[in-house]
Amino acid sequence: MSTKEKLISHVMKEEPVGSRSKVTVVGVGMVGMASAISILLKDLCDELAMVDVMEDKLKGEVMDLQHGSLFLKTKIVGDKDYSVTANSKVVVVTAGARQQEGESRLNLVQRNVNIFKFIIPNIVKYSPNCILMVVSNPVDILTYVAWKLSGFPRHRVIGSGTNLDSARFRHLIGEKLHLHPSSCHAWIVGEHGDSSVPVWSGVNVAGVSLQGLNPQMGTEGDGENWKAIHKEVVDGAYEVIKLKGYTSWAIGMSVADLVESIIKNMHKVHPVSTLVQGMHGVKDEVFLSVPCVLGNSGLTDVIHMTLKAEEEKQLQKSAETLWGVQKELTL
């Protein structure tokens, strides 16, 4: 008799039970690992699967996390074979070529499209009913690519979009007003990146419109120079990359925030990347961030934002820029 047999006596034979809230993270780079740890520490799933083509790095990261199993409630698995991801509820894609210092997000594009041609069909094969969340940059274009390659309905393919930009925006407004970001309501929509659109008309604290108090807010003629805050949001990622080589923690927390809304069926509104054709005068098949409701079925609703003419024009310009790149892609 083995030690195990001496210690434990069986009462019944267990039938294998599938995971009820499995999440997969594709890519164990800085963003993938920050997303993984954020998801684990928020206790969002009963199983976390990780995949990557770099086998040693993957093995090391999985082992390192498994060594902390005592402090977690989640089963952690990893393999370069996508069968490990089978029956995931949410699949988070962070894999891709990393943005170099000074490189625009749009520049990355074709490099990452080629990587997606391998990843997406594998996800679809093993988790045909999952909600696909794209984080890799340029996120809006790659969400479109993932949607096209997966054949999924649009409500099951979302991009992390401007969820992080809006968080940065709210943090910086909070710094200026000496308030917690959760009390500063503000939205950034459009492209995640250089042509994102701050909705100054909607910025409020406790329902008090800041533009109502300062009609010049967000314009060139504003003596308080609020416009600089949006510039800081846009430059924020480049600044972090310049200082530490990559961004990870904030985007990881942002991903976990989105995963939580889906897994817990929260019906919470987030600015995430979705198909905006036909909204705000956008004519082309592009994905941009607008406020969306996230729940168990994915992206269930879109909120109709009241945008000023100037804001709408910026959004359309974003869409044109993205379409210009998209139509050149070989899918």
UniProtKB/Swiss-Prot annotation:
What top-level class of enzyme does the UniProt entry assign? oxidoreductase
Catalytic residue positions? H192 (proton acceptor)
What Gene3D superfamilies does the record point to?
Answer: Lactate dehydrogenase/glycoside hydrolase, family 4, C-terminal (3.90.110.10), NAD(P)-binding Rossmann-like Domain (3.40.50.720)
Keywords, comma-separated and alphabetical: Cytoplasm, NAD, Oxidoreductase
Locations listed in the record: Cytoplasm
Residues binding substrate, per UniProt: R105, N137, R168, T247
Q: Does the keyword Protein biosynthesis apply?
A: no
Q: Where are the transmembrane segments?
A: none
Q: Which reaction does it catalyse?
A: (S)-lactate + NAD(+) = pyruvate + NADH + H(+)
Q: Which GO terms describe its molecular function?
A: L-lactate dehydrogenase activity
Name the EC number(s): 1.1.1.27
Q: Please provide, in alphabetical order, the Gene Ontology terms of the cellular component aspect for this entry.
A: cytoplasm
GO-annotated biological processes: lactate metabolic process
Disulphide-bonded residues? none
Q: Which InterPro entries match?
A: L-lactate/malate_DH, L-lactate_DH, L-lactate_DH_AS, Lactate/malate_DH_C, Lactate/malate_DH_N, Lactate_DH/Glyco_Ohase_4_C, NAD(P)-bd_dom_sf
Signal peptide location in the record?
none
Subunit annotation? Homotetramer.
Family of this protein? Belongs to the LDH/MDH superfamily. LDH family.
What is the recorded name of this protein?
L-lactate dehydrogenase A chain
Naturally occurring in which organism (per UniProt): Champsocephalus gunnari (Mackerel icefish)
Q: What is the lineage of its organism?
A: Eukaryota, Metazoa, Chordata, Craniata, Vertebrata
